């Protein structure tokens, strides 16, 4: 243990491993103070950089990594110049050294290139290292290998061979190479890095007979039944494993010959989106992603984690399991928080992979998306917003004293939620721009949705339409820079629109800036003059979509810290480690308990930080914290940060919490009504109307049955029961238009307080929603109502007018 101090890494390249080993000996002899000493073969270094997505270095030979403490770096630098250069060492560029240092604990990154690895670990005396490496090179060619110096006398060697477990026979045969590497290490005085289950027979020689017996005695005294780590490290009663190890060694020559002629056939692999199968098999199942997974925090099930999903995809690719709607729902519920990406030991682009699954599952595999998204899709196509509001009212929020242009290089994007639900976000932005002297454009009623709900829901057909429309509008209006309040809009206009523009062959060169960046610039240019606010202590919640997706962490903090009277305190998890709010996907799919649990973690953190309120900038985060707080009775308030800015500018801020709660009451009822259970209950309640509008052939059949004796009717109805789930999907397209007025009346009865615009649009939107949704919903709904249908038919035959 030493006092905390930064290190300064040096990477020294050599032409041959022999030169590098000589340098190691010189380093030991000179007793130079170096905190960390390791090395890698040329192949290891190149593969490591390739796995990280870096441009592979031109250096082909092995390299030595020296990482002294900063206070001792000058002496090490002098040693490199005086001694190692004379031995053929060449100092490689600093960025390459920094990468090698930062990646020193992540050799498993190579697995992405496999997507499987065959590792071998051993410890070799420094005196025998040269001969051992020469034999390894003669046997295998250039190995991907790294080593670390242990007390100057031994070197821990870890070698890697790339493999592919999707070729099971090849993979099994290739694994014998790891034993061959180990045997060469033993030959030159080495021993296993760890014993585990495979090398327990070597325990006496590794520990020494005296220590070995002492360890066995202690283990037996503490664990007489050998319950803990049985058959590991000290002794093994597993004779089968010992026999298998011997057989593997004896059969190695045959394995090598077999592998050379065996065709490489992947068994039963089913297609996945590009790159996803490789990533699923590259996942090492380490579980580092699990503690940071937002969905896991709310659900508590392994299936919610990236590790669980990659395991499922691996089994799916093998043909051992298939998707069902429940599993699809789990994939779609990923919050896109991106907390897992930096934790992945293999650098898998997890969030981007699960993005690809959305379109794959909904568009290609034709599973249902969440019911709410069907209404959003219909509303967006009809009125350019997800809230089923009228397009003509999109700009009603604009303050009367603010003027703007219809076109120009600098423009503002409000987004659907700020335009219709919590307008303080957009109104504040306009007032700040005015005070800062900005001239800008706003598209008004021509502004569309950013497309986030369509992309997240897997409805990529609708998302493509939105991308094309938006880019066309930007070009027509000469927009070069777009100022955006909503982080969801920011990431979709900045990242996803850019990616899709390339796919669609569209030109898209618009710079997208978050309003916090714009306000920070105005403050930095002394263009905003603030008054003192009433004293308050606030914390900042980092929205995922401008944080981990965009790296915008400091600008909103700079804005808040510039406001007199406001004390900013940090939550335990902040910036790149900030917790996700859980919205929107968990809120519309599993509001209780999943979504509430995720939000509670953040609300509790804010309270623990001593904050009076949370400031943030995301309408979805604000909506989530407000609704969850109301659900669980949490007192923490959440306010858009621009309210603090306009207050300091002399305007009155607004708390739109109640507006969020009011719209959620309606939206929650709509979601429940459109769920499988909600549709089933609607069919039960409207059974007389549905039966009265059956196709003609069913009416004739019912007429025939009505003339039969009661016993025969019951027999025929019983025979029809298994046919109903097969017949109804074909009959529903004819029934639905006839009962639409009844459905509209029913919806208004079940959803009191429905906004006037939504009520006005329902006759237009509902048929579209039902046509889109019902074919995918009916297979799940009909098993719940088949008994009700049979009972309704029986009552109808008896002349009943109403289904009880």
Residues covered by each model-derived region:
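Cofactor-cradling patches in redox/metallo enzymes
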Residues: 347, 417-510, 545-562, 567-675
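Peripheral docking tails and interdomain loops at the edges
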Residues: 222, 228-229, 233-242, 520-521, ...
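FAD-binding core of FAD-dependent oxidoreductases
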Residues: 1-4, 193-195, 448-449, 580-581
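Iron-sulfur-cluster electron-transfer modules
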Residues: 277-280, 304, 310-501, 507, ...
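Activity-critical C-terminal alpha-helical subdomain
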Residues: 199-263
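Acidic, glycine-rich loop-and-beta core segments that form the ion-binding/anion-interacting portion
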Residues: 31-67, 75-84, 466-521, 527-528
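C-terminal substrate-recognition/cap domain of FAD-linked oxidoreductases
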Residues: 2, 8, 14-180, 184, ...
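Short, charged low-complexity linear segments at domain edges
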Residues: 247-275, 304-325, 554-563, 589-596
